[in-house]
Amino acid sequence: MALPAIPQPLLTPLTEAAIFLVFTIDEGGEQAVHDVLADISGLQRSIGFRVPAGGLAAVVGIGSDAWDRLFEGPRPAELHPFVELTGDKHHAPRTPGDLLFHIRARQMDLCFEFATVVTNRLAGAASVIDEVHGFKYFEQRDLMGFVDGTENPSGQAAYVAVTVGDEDPDFAGSSYVIVQKYLHDMSEWNSLPVEEQENVIGRSKLEDLEMDDDTKPANSHTALTVIEDESGEQIQILRDNMPFGHVGSAEMGTYFIGYSASPTVTEQMLTNMFIGNPVGNYDRILDFSTAVTGINFFVPTADFLDDPPDAPTRLVPEATFTAPISDGSLGIGSLKRSAQQ
């Protein structure tokens, strides 16, 4: 009996530090990237061994366009580009991204070392197009002051929420992840009274208690991001969001990263937020927080990365024959000269 595939460490508890790296693969860099991906678990072990209590964990995601450039064979059933959304007032853009590295640890030096080594290994084959350094903000709060990730599943429920099952047997044990970088208008947000902020989020700010359905505004964040199946059971995702910021430029926000067994769950959440449910009833948080990136990735198992399928054979164009330019003769003299040589 075959053992189940070992997943990547996406169920690692939230940490104090994180780095999010998004790469695009350079033309002709596919084989080099393919080779680096097979070394990721070894790099994680080697760097993490230097600080055993540091909790270094790295998750690799592969984008829709990159998959066919890197691997022969089957393709994940639900892997597709990010679905761009344009509502009456707010927009969720689709942005480039072939590789995601979600790097976490209890201390930033481990994250930084791993990010540096991977980036150096990929030099000349892939280019960093987005880099975000996240940090824990007090008791898992975002920069808006609210606890983030309260409704995350745990234990077996978390495993079920993020793990592809028998519906796609070639990739059982894998996951999907959607990332977006949000920039906050902190001046505008901080101008709101706490009571109004709580109406935007749908939770109390200090106690982190969700409002009851009779009190919660229909356009609050919590009202629009609960997804239920046909029987009324909530379908969950795992959020590993992290705050980030630059004080000098006042650029600060939240890096949203949502793992799930199917991207359709997160996509429905985003549709509710940007388009509205019903249409026009968009998430009020978007009046203060702007999405500037949006990418879908597939997270294969650790076993897949350790021993990936071969890279596709690059087709070499067949040599073409170019007829000589005719001078109007039959070339008989040339044939005679050839015969005489």
From Swiss-Prot:
Q: What is its main location?
A: other
Keyword Methyltransferase appears in the UniProt entry:
no
Q: What is its EC number?
A: 1.11.1.-
- The segment annotated Targeting peptide runs over 304-341
- Entry-linked InterPro entries: Dimeric_a/b-barrel, Dyp_perox_C, Dyp_perox_N, Dyp_peroxidase
Which residues participate directly in catalysis?
D148
- Subcellular compartments: Encapsulin nanocompartment
One GO location term (cellular component): cytosol
Gene Ontology terms for molecular function: heme binding; metal ion binding; peroxidase activity
UniProt keyword annotations, A-Z: Encapsulin nanocompartment, Heme, Iron, Metal-binding, Oxidoreductase, Peroxidase
Q: Name the domain of life.
A: Bacteria
PANTHER family registered for this protein in UniProt = DEFERROCHELATASE/PEROXIDASE, DYP-TYPE PEROXIDASE FAMILY PROTEIN
* NCBIfam families assigned: Dyp_perox_fam
Summarizing the function annotation, the protein's role is: Cargo protein of a type 1 encapsulin nanocompartment. Has both general peroxidase activity and dye-decolorizing activity. Can catalyze the oxidation of both protoporphyrinogen IX and coproporphyrinogen III to their corresponding porphyrins. Also efficiently decolorizes the dyes alizarin red and Cibacron blue F3GA. This cargo-loaded encapsulin nanocompartment is probably involved in protection against oxidative damage.
Query: What does the similarity note say?
Result: Belongs to the DyP-type peroxidase family.
> Anything noted about its domains?
The C-terminal 38 residues (targeting peptide, TP) are sufficient to target this foreign proteins to the nanocompartment in vivo.
Protein's UniProt name: Dye-decolorizing peroxidase
